[in-house]
């Protein structure tokens, strides 16, 4: 009797594994070198086949540390001084999280095809929206749809690309891209998006395999640029309708990059304590600031005021001043350029 049941169980496991493999194999198109084409492409899935999360649960750092890898990345979000970490190990399976963090409706997003993480306010024209995953991509970037108007929105910049909300934008919410090791050290009492999602997934496994480390892409893009390797990591910064890309490797030799976007002086800096990159407009009412890094923080040469990595002056003549924070999104270069073909590229 046991032998018969054992064979039945083994057959179920075998065919279940085969069906799981077949799903991913058929979902993913044959890879190819990036080339130009229409920005919209079918994603080989149906709507909501990749399940976005709604009203997620959270766990402690100690609990999450049982399975998260120290070098794994995630998205850090702060509201009223409280911190949450949304690990890529979970996001890669769900792509979007409809969260409410201390009363603030947020949409936390991750595109495995672009390795881009971005956070938005879920309210559109004062109405709170819930989002799911769409059945197509735009410039190799996942599209999300809102369940009120069925409009589809690009993950990388939060712009409605089709539907009744065409052309509208979700308001970006500040976030930082950090490793689990850096985040748990900086915020040991913070909350972590729980692996208890209600879905059966192996959150220690990346279903995209070697995609993030090779130079092949799965979906065509409308525009491409060869100044950087296809999947070189950049931090994309937007200022109004203008944008700039800062290669991750630029922060290896410098922790502070001074630049000008659309005539506006900006600074992008790396916080050595958390490994995160943030960007700000660096002009005040009376000064265009130039920064250096010191043990106490970032110090401007013009007034010798000391600034935190969040752009707040905590000491000196400008104490109490806050720099205007600019939307900063980590991404593969090919995705960022396809979405922002007029972007400037930092190369100094």
Where are these regions (language model features)?
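N-terminal secretory signal peptides that target proteins for export/translocation
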Residues: 1-3
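Mid-to-C-terminal functional-domain signal that highlights helix-capping/loop sites
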Residues: 5-348
